[in-house]
């Protein structure tokens, strides 16, 4: 790890719950302008990794640096989208208020939001096609709509690094396509994104790089080098039944798409 200004550096990170280790000795460096997927079986520590980076779960050992800094002062450059299950959807707050929370890093918690902040929040809602729902209570929305709102909140933070914990879970195909389109747009602007993902059928198409995790780091690198039968087997072990076929199908699909683009 030779770049102090990498968006995300992790060294020898170990995390335990009730003295039971769930992550062991994780070493990672994520480069600027990459769209990175985190995959692995249930219980692999994927969400724990994201929460530890955000300071929501304490590390037992090792360290995390965001743009070369440790601690809370670095979080102003991070946009975070949590799992839907971790949110209290009954809290009486409007869609617009949720997105405005993403502006607190700019205005501070005790200062009033400005017209500019409201304008930014509305622009972000418009990007995810949720502006007509700005005054609606967040708990009255569908799962896919709620996920769009939290994505808008992350966009409102105008961050350089985005951490997203399974943003595609429970959404329809239209919402999923909208989300991946926004992620690619952010990447094109030089932003860095780390996304926990569970669907191997499209992982190779969605991401530039993959982190294969099962309590330990199995692999990290470009999808062509990491999304292989051998590394998937190491990651998922005996639970790997149809995943090798998925890997082959994804490779064939990418090949056919390339051939089609070259022939047109």
Predicted features along the sequence, with ranges:
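Conserved ABC ATPase signature
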Residues: 137-141, 145
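Helix-to-loop junction immediately C-terminal to a conserved catalytic motif
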Residues: 54
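Conserved ABC ATPase "signature" region
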Residues: 100, 115-133
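The feature captures the beta-strand-to-loop junction immediately N-terminal to the Walker
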Residues: 39-41
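Catalytic Walker B motif of ABC-type/P-loop ATPase nucleotide-binding domains
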Residues: 162-165
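H-loop/switch region of ABC-family ATPase nucleotide-binding domains
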Residues: 197-198
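Conserved ABC transporter NBD signature motif
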Residues: 62-76
């Amino acid at each position: 790890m030779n770049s102090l200004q990498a968006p995300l550096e992790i060294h020898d990170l170990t995390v335990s719950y009730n003295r039971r280790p769930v992550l062991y000795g994780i070493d990672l460096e994520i480069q600027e302008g990459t769209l990175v997927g985190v995959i692995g079986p249930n219980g692999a520590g994927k969400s724990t990794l994201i929460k530890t980076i955000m300071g929501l779960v304490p590390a037992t050992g090792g360290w995390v640096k965001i743009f070369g800094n440790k601690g809370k002062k670095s979080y102003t450059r991070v946009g975070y989208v949590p799992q839907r299950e971790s949110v209290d959807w009954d809290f009486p707050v409007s869609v617009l208020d949720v997105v405005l929370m993403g502006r607190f890093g700019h205005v501070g918690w005790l200062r009033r939001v400005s017209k500019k902040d409201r304008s930014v929040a509305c622009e972000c809602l418009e990007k995810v096609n949720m502006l007509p729902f700005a005054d609606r209570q967040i708990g009255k929305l569908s799962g896919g709509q709620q996920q769009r709102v939290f994505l808008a909140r992350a966009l409102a933070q105008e961050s350089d690094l985005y951490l997203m914990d399974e943003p595609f879970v429970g959404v329809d195909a239209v919402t999923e396509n909208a989300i991946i389109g926004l992620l690619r747009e952010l990447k094109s602007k030089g932003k860095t994104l780390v996304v926990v993902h569970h669907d191997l059928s499209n992982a190779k198409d969605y991401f530039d790089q993959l982190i294969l995790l099962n309590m330990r780091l199995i692999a990290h690198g470009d999808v062509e080098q990491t999304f292989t039968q051998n590394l998937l087997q190491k990651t998922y072990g005996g639970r790997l039944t149809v995943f090798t076929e998925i890997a082959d199908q994804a490779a064939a699909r990418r090949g056919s798409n390339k051939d089609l683009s070259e022939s047109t």
